[in-house]
């Protein structure tokens, strides 16, 4: 190997670099090529529930690199010479959804963009809108998809809803008027009812839920400022579940449930530190049996309620391991009961699977 370096190194520096890299691999000490006896065991987490139900942690992800197929030896060798490629990573993720093809879409206010993870096809895309005179993406918050997998993203700072095609191509912005002013103060939660051709959006500062047509025209609003039934104090996330609309009423420390016309039905939660109480409710979703999952960002846990508002169980604690959270935020459950939870401060999305009784899916069109 030394003779080869002396012979070719001066005339062919690139060859010299490759030879050096190969030499480094070949000359590794014996202990480095053996598996460590103290090798970390893959993390596991599982919760057994009544009636044979089970909630299982599957994996977590945080960067583009985890979507890509395993790199070959020659790719890794090239990385030694030229440097490893730069991969996009989650910075301050907030909201999550998955589309009909299983792609996972994550908003990231910290990166001022939206990540699309396609594990099935080993593809990744990052959506940004910078340097636009109008409709620049500044602080993407919540995300939803329609029946055609078009992507809808609220931006709480820009005060608009960005609409993208499934491939990430920008379509238009909703809520921005010609003069630059808009009718949203701080749009946050969003859900799309494709069958009714309607979009539901919470405006946190207006204490209202806007109901729009697909062109962005206002059809009606739901709610007003207050702490009574049908009134809000900084509403944030929302979700369509079967015939109902569920809204996180953050500073009233509850989730309110309406029918889709806006008529109040009931509420879940209250301020407190006992099971069933809420302190900082964030993401919400429902599984195939209609049970309601509510993230509490401050407590680092998820509480699960039945359709009568009774607490069934809760899971999670503060930490960095499987099933542990630091400032969890968005939550989404797909039609296969895959549970996606944004673990914001840990800069990752944790993936669980709920094995229940497999009743018909109650989740509304997103």
Please provide the spans of the model-predicted regions.
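Bacterial N-terminal signal peptides
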Residues: 15-27
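Bacterial N-terminal signal peptides that target proteins for export
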Residues: 2-18
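N-terminal non-cleavable signal-anchor helices
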Residues: 3, 24-27, 242
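N-terminal regions of proteins, emphasizing targeting and processing segments when present
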Residues: 6, 29-30
């Amino acid at each position: 190997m030394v003779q080869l370096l002396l012979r070719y190194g001066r005339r062919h520096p690139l060859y010299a670099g490759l030879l050096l890299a190969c030499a480094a691999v070949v000359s590794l000490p014996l202990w480095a090529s053996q598996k460590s006896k103290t090798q970390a065991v893959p993390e596991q987490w599982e919760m057994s529930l009544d009636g044979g139900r089970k909630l299982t942690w599957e994996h977590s992800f945080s960067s583009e690199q985890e979507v890509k197929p395993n790199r070959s030896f020659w790719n890794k060798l090239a990385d030694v010479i030229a440097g490893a490629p730069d991969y996009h990573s989650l910075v301050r993720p907030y909201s999550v959804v998955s589309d009909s093809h299983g792609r996972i879409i994550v908003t990231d206010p910290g990166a001022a963009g939206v990540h699309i993870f396609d594990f099935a096809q080993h593809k990744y895309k990052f959506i940004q809108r910078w340097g636009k005179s109008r409709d620049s993406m500044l602080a993407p918050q919540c995300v939803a998809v329609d029946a055609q997998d078009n992507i809808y993203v609220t931006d709480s700072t820009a005060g608009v809803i960005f609409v993208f095609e499934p491939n990430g191509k920008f379509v238009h912005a909703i809520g921005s008027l010609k003069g630059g002013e808009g009718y949203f103060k701080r749009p946050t939660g969003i859900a799309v009812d494709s069958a009714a051709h309607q979009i539901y959006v919470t405006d946190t500062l207006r204490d209202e839920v806007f109901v729009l047509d697909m062109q962005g025209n206002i059809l009606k609003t739901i709610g007003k400022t207050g702490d009574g039934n049908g009134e809000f104090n900084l509403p944030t996330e929302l979700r369509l579940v079967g015939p109902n609309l569920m809204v996180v009423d953050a500073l009233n420390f509850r989730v309110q449930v309406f029918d889709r016309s806006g008529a109040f039905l009931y509420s879940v939660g209250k301020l407190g530190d006992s099971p069933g109480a809420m302190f900082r409710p964030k993401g919400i979703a429902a599984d195939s049996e209609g049970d309601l999952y509510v993230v509490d960002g401050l407590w680092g846990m998820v509480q699960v309620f039945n359709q009568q508002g009774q607490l069934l169980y809760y899971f999670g604690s503060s930490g960095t391991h499987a099933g542990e959270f630091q400032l969890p935020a968005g939550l989404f459950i797909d039609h296969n009961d895959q549970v996606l939870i944004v673990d914001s401060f840990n800069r990752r999305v944790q993936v669980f699977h709920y094995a229940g009784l497999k009743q018909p899916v109650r989740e509304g069109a997103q």
